[in-house]
């Protein structure tokens, strides 16, 4: 089980990145638009730099929904391999059966 503080920090980052995503995308579009004057692009760069670091999507870490484990994460299932194995052996994951041949 991951530390509660790490899970909460990640959730705060996720919420902040979702709320600031539109503003960040518009500023990035201005910065990358080569047809605009350099002063306007530089001003957008400064505004982008003044935004909170945790509002960047890259700061969000994929974590297991069950245990909070940050590694060995399956995106499709939103859980780690350890949790998947435990729940699968209990028969709680639909369609997952223990292999036998």
From Swiss-Prot:
User: Which Gene Ontology molecular-function terms are recorded?
Assistant: rRNA binding; structural constituent of ribosome
One Pfam entry for this protein is Ribosomal_S14
Which biological processes are named by the entry's GO terms? Answer: translation
Concerning PROSITE patterns, the annotation shows:
RIBOSOMAL_S14 (PS00527)
Keyword Amino-acid biosynthesis present in the record's keywords: the answer is no
User: In which residue ranges is the amino acid composition biased (Basic residues)?
Assistant: 12-24
| Keywords for the protein's UniProt record, in alphabetical order | Ribonucleoprotein, Ribosomal protein, RNA-binding, rRNA-binding
- Does the entry feature the keyword Acyltransferase, yes or no? no
List the InterPro entries hit by this protein, alphabetically: Ribosomal_uS14, Ribosomal_uS14_bac/plastid, Ribosomal_uS14_CS
Region Disordered, annotated ranges:
1-24
Q: Which protein family is it in?
A: Belongs to the universal ribosomal protein uS14 family.
What quaternary structure, including any partners, is listed in this protein's UniProt entry?
Answer: Part of the 30S ribosomal subunit. Contacts proteins S3 and S10.
* Function, as annotated: Binds 16S rRNA, required for the assembly of 30S particles and may also be responsible for determining the conformation of the 16S rRNA at the A site.
The entry's protein name is Small ribosomal subunit protein uS14
The species this protein was found in = Azorhizobium caulinodans (strain ATCC 43989 / DSM 5975 / JCM 20966 / LMG 6465 / NBRC 14845 / NCIMB 13405 / ORS 571)
